[in-house]
């Protein structure tokens, strides 16, 4: 839905509209008013406006004049600004503020010469909302443990209310013996002392109990959230990962869930306890001394409010310090992760300087934070001591008039400090709860996503009757992250069974996109991809990728485990003999057995301990171990040296026998024996034929061959 709004001049002949009107009624009025007054290439209405693109042909002065008139009409119901200048300032400003707070925004351009200019609509990123229903699904399995923790927390809070009263009884016994010098002191003090010790012991047990239960609940909820989120992320289509950075996704799995777990445990334990103690101790204070309670009610909230403000400042400073620590960590992570590049350019000193600079900034911020905390704690101690002194002064006056006993004064002091600590804890927990809910909302946002391409579900073709014929029929496609850039345009191609088809062309022509559509990483915008006459959208994607198609990319990614497990990744149920057989087909068996640990050799993160040719041959073995009917080679040898390319090409020649093969080629020397070579340009096939046929045409293929030979490729 398009929203028209405030216009601001960008260039001499162009204006840009980038704000919306808050009212649908106002928006429709503006459109209708413009339709009556202006000459447009097409009528505008709220129901006729396209969601993604509009063509505007209204002269800019007319548009601005109508917008000003609308502002005057809508401002009649409100007091007018004192001057015309103020009107021109406040009118657009009000629209701007409203636009910042509400809904999506749009960007349009209108040329003063009435030329048609495309209008793009961009929806603002929606802030994720916290879902209590989703939280309930995670908490429900731990409900009994959670209820037990809540009951124990209430019990501990109730005991904390009783402890000041018991302390008062103890003080009264001591004061009576000091005043009267009568009776047996040890006998009189024994009963209240034993009761107080019993309360302390029971309070300790209850506190330990609810902390243990809450820890159990929090850890299990966090584990379930991590597992569920990771499952949701793995099920997302490739377009999702194109649009989101890996670091952000990992941060949701780690930092956000950790933040939510900590907030969840703190809010339930300390929040319930603090709230119970605050209410209970206030009641106790009133029964002990209504007069002192009145003074406390006046003073205490002011002090807590001031403490909350200072605490808010310190929390912001703490957040900045943590962000600076994260920057320093990022520098170190980048340097250590790319240590080979750092070493190759002798940049160790520069990386050290960068890291030291970030660490120094972090240290300075943390020193400032430490100073702030020290000042805050010092002032807090002064204020607390002043409160104690004031309470003793006022309580002493009441004691002098026999309105208050020494024990009651002691009880009042302890209870009032309990209230103050509880209120301060609640104010801190409020900020913690906000951060926790924000973190939870970010996690829940990804849990609710449904992939456009499902991971499983659909039909399967019996492998013994699978022929391997692939048809691309009138395919048009744009990547979801770049909808305005069409990669394939009415693309059609047939891969005959057990034949090799190569696609060549300049970079950006759409070659790798064809392979991605066959793997069903994406669905085409229009057209259909067929496998043995069936639309692949009706087939099970997991079966298609796991049993039918083998994919070998230009830069294979290996996992930081053994060679055996890396090859078995292509078929988890493969036996050791099947793994060895696949390695032999890929020309990898000899160099693998040359390792000290053979197939149990750990290849390091991303296969860092292997050469490019070795990694590529292990990747070929990984694809062959599942015996695929269709093989996709996406520039599988373009990154290798001549010797490695020769060995890998021998393996590929063996692997392609008896299979339908799609080759995405950069080095044209590797595809001269293909049954069909298709030359792509701008998303279309412009030439097709065998190597000799295309050379004889003297077209784009011949030009590419000539260009590569002049650059040193055979």
From Swiss-Prot:
It comes from Danio rerio (Zebrafish). One of its GO terms (cellular component) is membrane. Residues 470-707 form the ABC transporter domain. Belongs to the ABC transporter superfamily. ABCB family. Multidrug resistance exporter (TC 3.A.1.201) subfamily. One of its GO terms (biological process) is potassium ion transmembrane transport. ATP binds at residues 505-512. ATP-binding subunit of the mitochondrial ATP-gated potassium channel (mitoK(ATP)). Together with pore-forming subunit CCDC51/MITOK of the mitoK(ATP) channel, mediates ATP-dependent potassium currents across the mitochondrial inner membrane. An increase in ATP intracellular levels closes the channel, inhibiting K(+) transport, whereas a decrease in ATP levels enhances K(+) uptake in the mitochondrial matrix. Plays a role in mitochondrial iron transport. PANTHER family: ATP-DEPENDENT PERMEASE MDL1, MITOCHONDRIAL, MITOCHONDRIAL POTASSIUM CHANNEL ATP-BINDING SUBUNIT. It comes from the Eukaryota. It is found in: Mitochondrion inner membrane. The lineage of its organism: Eukaryota, Metazoa, Chordata, Craniata, Vertebrata. Keywords: ATP-binding, Ion transport, Membrane, Mitochondrion, Mitochondrion inner membrane, Nucleotide-binding, Potassium, Potassium transport, Transit peptide, Transmembrane, Transmembrane helix, Transport. Residues 148-435 form the ABC transmembrane type-1 domain. It is a multi-pass membrane protein. Its main location: mitochondrion. This is Mitochondrial potassium channel ATP-binding subunit. Disulfide bonds: none annotated. The keyword Thylakoid does not apply.
């Amino acid at each position: 839905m398009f929203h028209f709004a405030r216009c601001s001049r960008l260039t001499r002949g162009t204006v840009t509209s980038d704000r919306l009107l808050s009212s649908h009624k106002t928006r429709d009025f503006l459109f209708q008013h413009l339709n009556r007054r202006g000459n447009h290439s097409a009528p505008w209405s709220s129901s006729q406006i396209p969601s993604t693109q509009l063509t505007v042909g209204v002269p800019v002065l007319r548009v601005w004049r109508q917008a000003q008139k609308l502002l005057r009409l809508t401002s009649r119901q409100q007091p007018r600004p004192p001057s015309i200048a103020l009107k021109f300032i406040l009118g657009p400003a009000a629209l701007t503020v409203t636009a910042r707070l509400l809904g999506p925004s749009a960007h349009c351009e209108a040329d003063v010469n009435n030329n048609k200019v495309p209008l793009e609509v961009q929806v603002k990123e929606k802030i994720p909302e916290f879902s209590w229903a989703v939280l309930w699904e995670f908490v429900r399995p731990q409900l009994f443990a959670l209820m037990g923790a809540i009951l124990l927390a209430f019990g501990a809070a109730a005991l904390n209310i009783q402890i000041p009263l018991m302390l008062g009884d103890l003080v009264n016994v001591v004061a009576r013996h000091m005043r009267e010098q009568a009776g047996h002191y040890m006998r009189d003090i024994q009963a209240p002392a034993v009761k107080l010790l019993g309360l302390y012991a029971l309070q300790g047990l209850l506190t330990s109990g609810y902390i243990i239960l809450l820890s159990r609940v929090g850890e299990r909820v966090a584990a379930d959230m991590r597992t569920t989120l990771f499952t949701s992320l793995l099920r997302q289509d490739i377009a999702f990962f194109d649009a989101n950075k890996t670091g952000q996704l990992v941060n949701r799995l780690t930092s956000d869930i950790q933040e939510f777990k900590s907030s969840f445990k703190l809010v339930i334990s300390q929040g319930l306890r603090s709230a119970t103690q605050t209410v209970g101790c206030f009641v106790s204070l009133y029964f002990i001394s209504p007069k002192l309670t009145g003074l406390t009610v006046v003073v205490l909230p002011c002090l807590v409010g001031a403490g909350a403000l200072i605490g808010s400042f310190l929390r912001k400073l703490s957040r900045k310090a943590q962000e600076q620590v994260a920057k320093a960590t990022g520098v170190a992570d980048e340097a250590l992760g790319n240590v080979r590049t750092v070493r190759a350019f002798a940049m160790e000193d520069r990386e050290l300087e960068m890291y030291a600079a970030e660490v120094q900034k972090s240290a300075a911020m943390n020193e400032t934070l430490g100073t702030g905390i020290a000042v805050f704690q010092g002032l807090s101690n002064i204020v607390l001591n002043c409160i104690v002194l004031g309470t003793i002064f006022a309580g002493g006056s009441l004691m002098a008039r026999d309105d208050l006993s020494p024990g009651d004064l002691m009880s009042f002091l302890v209870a009032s400090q309990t209230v103050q600590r509880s209120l301060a804890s609640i104010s801190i927990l409020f900020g913690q709860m906000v951060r926790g809910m924000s973190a939870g909302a970010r996690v829940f946002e990804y849990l609710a996503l449904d992939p456009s391409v499902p991971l499983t579900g659909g039909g399967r073709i019996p492998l013994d009757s699978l022929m391997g014929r692939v048809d691309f029929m009138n395919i048009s496609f744009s990547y979801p992250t770049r909808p305005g850039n069409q990669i394939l345009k009415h693309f059609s191609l047939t891969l005959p069974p057990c034949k090799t088809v190569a696609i060549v062309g300049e970079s950006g022509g759409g070659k790798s996109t064809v392979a991605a559509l066959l793997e069903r990483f994406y669905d085409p915008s229009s057209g259909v991809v067929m496998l043995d006459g069936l639309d692949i959208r009706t087939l099970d994607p997991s079966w298609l990728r796991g049993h039918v198609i083998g994919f070998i990319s230009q830069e294979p990614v290996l996992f930081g485990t053994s060679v055996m497990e890396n090859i078995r990744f292509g078929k988890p149920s493969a036996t050791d003999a099947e793994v060895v057989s696949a390695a032999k087909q890929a020309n990898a068996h000899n160099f693998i057995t040359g390792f000290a640990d053979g197939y149990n050799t750990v290849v390091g993160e991303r296969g860092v301990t292997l050469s490019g040719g070795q990694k590529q041959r292990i990747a070929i073995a990984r694809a062959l171990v599942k015996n695929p009917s269709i093989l996709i080679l996406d520039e599988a040898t373009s990154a290798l040296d001549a010797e490695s390319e020769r060995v890998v090409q021998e393996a590929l020649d063996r692997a392609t026998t008896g299979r339908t093969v799609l080759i995405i080629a950069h080095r044209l020397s590797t595809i001269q024996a293909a049954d069909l070579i298709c030359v792509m340009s701008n998303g279309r096939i412009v030439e097709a034929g065998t190597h000799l046929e295309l050379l004889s045409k003297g077209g784009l293929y011949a030009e590419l061959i000539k260009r590569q030979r002049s650059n040193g490729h055979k």
